[in-house]
Amino acid sequence: MAKSRRDRNSWGGFSEKSSDWSSEEEEPVRKAGPVQVLIVKDDHSFELDEAALNRILLSQAVRDKEVVAVSVAGAFRKGKSFLMDFMLRYMYNQESVDWVGDYNEPLTGFSWRGGSERETTGIQIWSEVFLINKLDGKKVAVLLMDTQGTFDSQSTLRDSATVFALSTMISSIQVYNLSQNVQEDDLQHLQLFTEYGRLAMEETFLKPFQSLIFLVRDWSFPYEFSYGADGGAKFLEKRLKVSGNQHEELQNVRKHIHSCFTNISCFLLPHPGLKVATNPNFDGKLKEIDDEFIKNLKILIPWLLSPERLDIKEINGNKITCRGLLEYFKAYIKIYQGEELPHPKSMLQATAEANNLAAVATAKDTYNKKMEEVCGGDKPFLAPNDLQSKHLQLKEESVKLFRGVKKMGGEEFSRRYLQQLESEIDELYIQYIKHNDSKNIFHAARTPATLFVVIFITYVIAGVTGFIGLDIIASLCNMIMGLTLITLCTWAYIRYSGEYRELGAVIDQVAAALWDQGSTNEALYKLYSAAATHRHLCHQAFPAPKSEPTQQPEKKKI
């Protein structure tokens, strides 16, 4: 059974604290703090700490409550954890008018610090889930998530995309933390990350994500757009506006963002002051922060977390509980742990790939057009040696054309695309060989000729063996002859009607295999030998006495 107690906490107020961390049995009281639930390993793979998530989301007090998941994401070293700790102060002191606390008290909660190196990795969740009464009286669970900053020096683009996408998929309120302005590259990165998240989700006809809040820190143009939500709304409307005179690429970015989120808003926040930015020993005391920042901070946090602003997490229109959120967490991380999704690429890599693929396509098209001129559909049959010679010449020209195109990525990067070009040209050459062979009347007649030879040979052997009393062999030859005759008729019907083409291909392959057992001369020699044997056996069986004197000189002549 859960125990509750009112404790003075480090955020300057009193709050109800629950010590129930398990759905099965009571455990000792644990101090609330950040818990790493998504771990990014050194090999850039991802691991979910299911035990930690179970303790947080399956607590008896919250597991069946509908959940509001608030996440802060954005570039590293832009104050995300710093902001999260003020959210914690508000959640612990909502009933207090001066919820920001003592001006001399250090800021604690999620780990943060000044400097240029990253602090948070993966995804962290505050271990205590807050129970809040909404305006309609429904009690909901509020989960606070802090995320690893994007584009730090130790993370790949896939790391950044996965963490951002996963936090967006899990959260009902995603705060996109930006510095100074909303630039075009910020929107492009948002497009990439949200698309990476949408790929991992099941197909839905609804907008896949809920609330997106652009939080612009260190806003320096209050004379254009005032601090706060109103100025932010006007600024964002201008920034995300789609107009006809925009380039198609810019329009697509904005349309994509609008198609992904149900609600989009913006808040402009001033700079916290030089002491915060330059003092290496700054520990979050309010007395060192500019008054203008504190004034707007007192507006921002309630604007984000007040009961009327809390959006319950929904997936495909269904409200999600803490228990359900745990299952989605597990399902989503399995997708990102696998190889089903394409790996996102840097702009340079994507551009270099497109550049090289375009060069491959151009060179391949050149080869194709010139080979069509040599042995295309209306061209006569070309000797195989001449065709091969022309192929080698045009292949060399295509490779030279590929190498002559200016490409991004360097020689090493382009080498595999050169190999791809050569491989595709060789495949085209095989098709041209088949097309050229089909124009050869002797090649086209190979299948019926082979079948006729088989029929004739089996007919002769059947006659001879039947005559000398080897009825079993004769019957076998007759059966083979009959089957071959049926095969020949079937092949003729397939060629005439165009039906059962797969069966026709099998017949051609069998005939080709028989043909390849020997040249045409060898086949004719076998026919001649069979005929001569048949004639010799007939003379032995039916001697002609009157003819013997005349035959004797003939034998001598031979």
Swiss-Prot record:
Oligomeric form and interacting partners: Monomeric and homodimeric. The homodimer, transiently formed by two molecules on opposing membranes, is the active form mediating ER membrane fusion. Interacts with REEP1, REEP5, RTN3 and RTN4 (via the transmembrane region); these proteins are involved in endoplasmic reticulum tubular network organization. Interacts with ZFYVE27; both proteins are involved in endoplasmic reticulum tubular network organization. Interacts with ARL6IP1; both proteins are involved in endoplasmic reticulum tubular network organization.
UniProt keyword Glycoprotein present: no
Region (Autoinhibitory domain): 521-558
Bilayer disposition of the protein: Multi-pass membrane protein
Pfam families: GBP (PF02263)
GO biological process, one term: endoplasmic reticulum tubular network membrane organization
Organism in which the protein naturally occurs: Mus musculus (Mouse)
Keywords attached to this entry: Acetylation, Cell projection, Coiled coil, Endoplasmic reticulum, Golgi apparatus, GTP-binding, Hydrolase, Magnesium, Membrane, Metal-binding, Nucleotide-binding, Phosphoprotein, Transmembrane, Transmembrane helix
EC number of the protein: 3.6.5.-
InterPro entries in UniProt: G_GB1_RHD3_dom, Guanylate-bd_C_sf, Guanylate-bd_N, P-loop_NTPase
Upper taxonomic lineage: Eukaryota, Metazoa, Chordata, Craniata, Vertebrata
Described function: Atlastin-1 (ATL1) is a membrane-anchored GTPase that mediates the GTP-dependent fusion of endoplasmic reticulum (ER) membranes, maintaining the continuous ER network. It facilitates the formation of three-way junctions where ER tubules intersect. Two atlastin-1 on neighboring ER tubules bind GTP and form loose homodimers through the GB1/RHD3-type G domains and 3HB regions. Upon GTP hydrolysis, the 3HB regions tighten, pulling the membranes together to drive their fusion. After fusion, the homodimer disassembles upon release of inorganic phosphate (Pi).
UniProt: GTP binding residues: R77, K78, G79, K80, S81, F82, R217, D218, V276
Keyword Manganese attached: no
Region (Linker): 439-447
Residue intervals on the Lumenal side: 471
Protein name: Atlastin-1
